[in-house]
């Protein structure tokens, strides 16, 4: 409530609010990466609103990493708190843009092979746009442009289906495969927004540059195909009144220019942005407000 009051005071003409909610990835190799909701601590739970996200309680959820006895991230908000926040924003006459966000909780000396080099450790807290194949395109033994690349992308997205989710007593329940994958992440929040009566807009993804540029053939981009299916599924959950889109990174939106000497340019996101379920072309760009 205080945050909304401060927003109204500082930006009186505001009409729309982005609601950013994070799950946490644990590996830059897409076939090894899991995405999970996490908490900052397990010392005490909220009353009368205990922490619950996608079937995880505070006692069963993972804890975000700590450095010098301090959490390096804020945790995932409880589902119930998100419903309250959406309701409050709507009461204030503000449009809600729901933004599921991937944070990479990878710390020093992680022992995870770096897909972009021969290093035995992946970088600390990397950008989600660096999630890629077991070996990135251009690296020796990369599966890019082979069927194996498609299989690795499929492992990241997972097999969760719309029918695996149910709304029971105002909560989202999941009964699908025992996996923590991208489809489970996005479809969970699509159903949560449905409980809230819908939102103005919903991002099905953002800044997944290292994934969207993966090829399982010369001109076939399996992540884009997976996002197209995800858009259809989210549309089935949220109906026709919620705008859907994908927010590309500023270095991703204009096409893929493989650094292989071919001179090729692939407008790989066009099939996604052109499909009927997508309402807007999103672009994450960080422009300075002043000199």
Task: Report each predicted region and the residues it spans.
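Noncatalytic carbohydrate-binding groove/subsite architecture in carbohydrate-active enzymes
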Residues: 146-150, 154-291
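Glycine-centered loop/turn motif at secondary-structure junctions
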Residues: 90-94, 197-198
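N-terminal substrate-binding region of glycoside hydrolase catalytic domains
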Residues: 1-83, 88, 95, 99-181, ...
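A structural alpha-helix within SAM-dependent methyltransferase catalytic domains
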Residues: 8, 83-90, 190-194, 235
């Amino acid at each position: 409530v205080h945050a909304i009051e401060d927003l109204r005071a500082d930006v009186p003409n505001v009409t729309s609010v982005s609601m950013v909610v994070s799950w946490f990835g644990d590996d830059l190799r897409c076939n090894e990466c899991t995405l999970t909701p996490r908490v900052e601590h397990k010392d005490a739970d909220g009353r009368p609103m205990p922490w619950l996200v996608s079937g995880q309680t505070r006692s069963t959820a993972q804890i975000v990493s700590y450095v010098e006895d301090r959490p390096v991230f804020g945790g995932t908000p409880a589902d119930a708190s998100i419903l309250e926040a959406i309701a409050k924003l709507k009461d204030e006459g503000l449009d809600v843009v729901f933004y599921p966000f991937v944070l990479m909780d990878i710390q020093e000396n992680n022992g995870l092979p770096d897909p972009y080099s021969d290093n035995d450790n992946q970088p600390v807290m990397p950008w989600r746009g660096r999630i890629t194949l077991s070996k990135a395109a251009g690296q020796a033994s990369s599966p890019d442009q082979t069927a194996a690349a498609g299989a690795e992308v499929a492992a990241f997205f997972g097999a969760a289906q719309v029918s695996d989710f149910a709304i029971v007593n105002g909560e989202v329940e999941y009964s699908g495969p025992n996996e923590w994958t991208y489809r489970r992440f996005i479809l969970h929040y699509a159903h949560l927004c449905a409980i809230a009566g819908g939102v103005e807009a919903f991002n099905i993804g953002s800044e997944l540059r290292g994934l969207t540029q993966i090829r399982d053939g010369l001109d076939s981009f399996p992540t884009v195909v997976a996002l197209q299916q995800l858009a259809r599924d989210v549309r089935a959950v949220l109906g026709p009144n919620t705008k859907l889109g994908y927010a590309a990174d500023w270095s991703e939106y204009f096409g893929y220019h493989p650094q292989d000497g071919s001179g090729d340019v692939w407008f790989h996101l066009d099939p996604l942005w052109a499909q009927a379920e997508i309402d807007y072309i999103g672009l994450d760009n960080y422009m300075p407000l002043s000199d």
